[in-house]
Amino acid sequence: MKTYLAKPNEVPKKWYVIDATGKPLGRLAAKIAVILRGKHKPQFTPNVDTGDYVIVINAEKVVLTGKKLDKDGYRYHTKYPGGLKFIPYRRLLEKHPEKAIEIAVRGMLPKNRLRDRFMRKLKVYRGPNHPHAAQKPEVLEI
């Protein structure tokens, strides 16, 4: 028997809505990364985009446990000497809560050509409203 390899047009894509209210950021990002990759499907193939679309609502209500709001944060480098920048999660969640979720999910996806394709299937919104009602997304409890 041959090994099954999924083709991108054979795998049906579904849309899911996840409410981030009161959910820890890391656990939420891990579940989203699994759905975006398609690892929850029996047709999963590592080199093919078999994942589904994910809509995250109420991004501003995501929580971080312990002292991570002030202690941890988002680091990036400007490529100039002494250009290491640090933004604490407290400031990031106040100004751009969507970006905090996107950064966490991006770090949990594989570092290859498919990562940008997976990230295009992630839609994060502040508040309970989203413009994707026409896709008839299913509510997913985490």
Swiss-Prot record:
Keywords: Ribonucleoprotein, Ribosomal protein. It holds the Pfam family Ribosomal_L13. GO terms for cellular component: cytosolic large ribosomal subunit. InterPro entries: Ribosomal_uL13 (IPR005822), Ribosomal_uL13_bac-type (IPR005823), Ribosomal_uL13_sf (IPR036899). One of its GO terms (biological process) is translation. GO terms for molecular function: mRNA binding; structural constituent of ribosome. Gene3D superfamilies: Ribosomal protein L13. This protein is one of the early assembly proteins of the 50S ribosomal subunit, although it is not seen to bind rRNA by itself. It is important during the early stages of 50S assembly. Part of the 50S ribosomal subunit. NCBIfam families: rplM_bact. Belongs to the universal ribosomal protein uL13 family. PANTHER family: LARGE RIBOSOMAL SUBUNIT PROTEIN UL13M (PTHR11545:SF2), RIBOSOMAL PROTEIN L13 (PTHR11545). This is Large ribosomal subunit protein uL13. It comes from Caldicellulosiruptor bescii (strain ATCC BAA-1888 / DSM 6725 / KCTC 15123 / Z-1320). The lineage of its organism: Bacteria, Bacillati, Bacillota, Bacillota incertae sedis, Caldicellulosiruptorales. The gene is rplM.
